[in-house]
From Swiss-Prot:
It comes from Erythrobacter litoralis (strain HTCC2594). PANTHER family: ATP SYNTHASE SUBUNIT A. Keywords: ATP synthesis, Cell inner membrane, Cell membrane, CF(0), Hydrogen ion transport, Ion transport, Membrane, Transmembrane, Transmembrane helix, Transport. This is ATP synthase subunit a. It is found in: Cell inner membrane. CDD domains: ATP-synt_Fo_a_6.
Length: 262
């Protein structure tokens, strides 16, 4: 952001920039420098580990920290039991970690640290990151499906009661819709987070332009934009939680297909 010139590039915030090892850190021609994206993912992982560790005291009368961790765990446990059944409990560690990792990453990217010279990076606004998370979930679905049901897993793509002549038509349609799942799962989170951050950055450019243009233009454009920024920021906090929940929810539904073939 360049306040002096009043220019704000809304896409600049998504740039992946090397922090360590920008030169000579290559494997098979690919640069493996430690980037801002990796740094914020590492920070998210550390904070998540501290959050969980702090809530594992197992006190008979739990403190606020322990209650918070147990509340999130119970929330995920209940969701999996509703969507999968008793068999869903064994997936609590994964889905809980997935949900919290996305939630922490979304929220960290909203922190107003720019005033301190620190520029938060929302790694969930990159399709490569959300894509990897979706592929991991999809891989678990495939492993569970074939491990538990073998080739009978393919019966998932033929709904019960389908007339025999319709199977050659229904099967490829169901298979394609199944294979598209990781793409749609990743795209949903990526678009939601990216759109919100772009909107906030555009509004911030209006505020800066209003300040630089003088009091009159500032009151006419800058002040309403600033108020709108506050409202959008509050909405983005809500979206951060909703998108983490949706990702975890859809993952649980996909695992249910692998576990129960429906």
């Amino acid at each position: 952001m360049a306040a002096e010139s009043g220019k704000v590039d809304p896409m600049k915030q998504f740039s992946i920039e090397p922090m360590l090892g920008s030169e000579g850190w290559e494997i098979a021609g690919y640069n493996i420098a430690f980037t801002n994206s990796a740094a914020w993912m590492a920070l998210t992982t550390v904070l998540l580990a501290v959050f969980v560790w702090g809530g594992m005291k197992g006190q008979l009368v739990p403190g606020r920290w322990q209650m918070m961790v147990e509340s999130f765990t119970s929330f995920i446990d209940d969701m999996l039991e509703v969507n999968i059944g008793k068999a869903g409990r064994k997936y609590v560690p994964y889905v809980f970690s997935l949900f919290m990792f996305i939630l922490f990453g979304n929220l960290l990217g909203l922190l107003p640290l720019g005033v301190l010279g620190i520029h938060p990076f929302t790694f969930t606004s990159h399709f490569t990151i959300t894509g990897v998370l979706a592929i991991i979930s999809f891989s678990i679905v495939l492993i569970v499906g074939f491990w538990k049901h073998g080739f009978h897993f393919f019966s998932l793509f033929v709904p019960s009661g389908t007339p025999l002549p319709m199977i050659p038509i229904i099967f490829p349609i169901e298979l394609i819709s199944f294979l598209v799942r990781p793409f749609s799962l990743a795209l949903r989170l990526f678009v939601a987070m990216m759109a919100g951050h772009v909107l906030l950055k555009v509004l911030s450019s209006f505020v800066i332009d209003g300040i630089n243009a003088g009091a009159g233009f500032g009151l006419l454009v800058g002040a309403p934009s600033f108020i709108l920024m506050i409202g959008i920021s509050a909405l983005e906090i809500l979206v951060a939680g909703i998108q983490a929940y949706v990702f975890a929810l859809l993952t649980s539904l996909y695992i249910n297909d692998a576990e129960n073939l429906h």
